[in-house]
Amino acid sequence: EVVVRFPVAADSALDGATLKGLQLNIEPGFTVLAIRRGGGYVYRPRGQVRLSAGDEVIASGPDEGQALLAAMCGWQLVEDDEGEDELVPVG
């Protein structure tokens, strides 16, 4: 299990979607712990919460699901020279 923080990019799969509609707990197996929005946090968000570009999703789930969640947020995980994951915009 890992905890990740990914910003929601404009026009990504998460931009404008509800948590319920995304079913992140099924694929890629992540539970959204909180959403950082406008300087504040929405803790333990419910399924009706709609995500928007600029939100930051804080979620826990399997290490192998990170790349898929990043892609759904509009990012690609790329390993840098030190072996750390770095977010690069898709497209």
Go through the PLM ranges and name each one.
Residues 1-3:
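Interdomain regulatory linker/hinge segments that flank or connect interaction modules
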